[in-house]
Amino acid sequence: MGLLLLLVGIGGGFGAMARFALTQATASISKQIPLGILLCNIIGSLIIGMMAAFLIETKLFNEDVSTYVRFLLVTGFLGGFTTFSSFSLDILNLLQRGEIFIAIGYIMVSVLASLIAVILGFYIVMGVYK
C-alpha cells in the first residue's frame, strides 16, 4: 500500500505539473475557450486508451508490474493531468459570463473528442500488437 501511494503521488505530481505547463502555454491562444484543460482531457483520454491496450497486449495486465504501471501512470499521472473539476469550473465560468452556446460547444467537444481519443489510443496500440 505504501509503495502504491508513493507511485500515485509521484505520478500525480508530474501530471499536475504537465497540466499547469500546458494550460500556461495555451493561455494566450484563446481567452474565450479554456483550451488548456480541453487539451489535457483529450490527450489524457488518448493516453489512457493507449495504456489500456498496451497492458492487455503485452500481457502485463495480470502481472505485478501492471499494478505499478497503472498506479504510477493512470491513477497518478493521468489523474493529475486530466481534471473533471477544472472542466466543470470552466463551464460555470462560461455560463456566468453569459456564453451559453460556447459552454454547450465546449461540453460537446470535450466529451466527444475525449471519447474519440480514448478509442483511438486503444486501437492504435492494439494495431501495433496485431
Swiss-Prot record:
**What NCBIfam families does its record include?**
crcB
Subcellular locations according to the entry: Cell inner membrane
* Membrane topology label: Multi-pass membrane protein
Please provide one cellular component term from the Gene Ontology annotations of this protein. plasma membrane
UniProt key word Membrane: yes
Transmembrane portions of the chain:
2-22, 36-56, 71-91, 100-120
* Name listed for the protein in its UniProt record: Fluoride-specific ion channel FluC
Which is one GO molecular function term here? Answer: metal ion binding
- Tell me the gene name: fluC
Keywords for this entry? Cell inner membrane, Cell membrane, Ion channel, Ion transport, Membrane, Metal-binding, Sodium, Transmembrane, Transmembrane helix, Transport
**InterPro entries the record matches:** FluC (IPR003691)
- Origin organism is Francisella tularensis subsp. tularensis (strain SCHU S4 / Schu 4)
The UniProt catalytic activity note for this protein reads: fluoride(in) = fluoride(out)
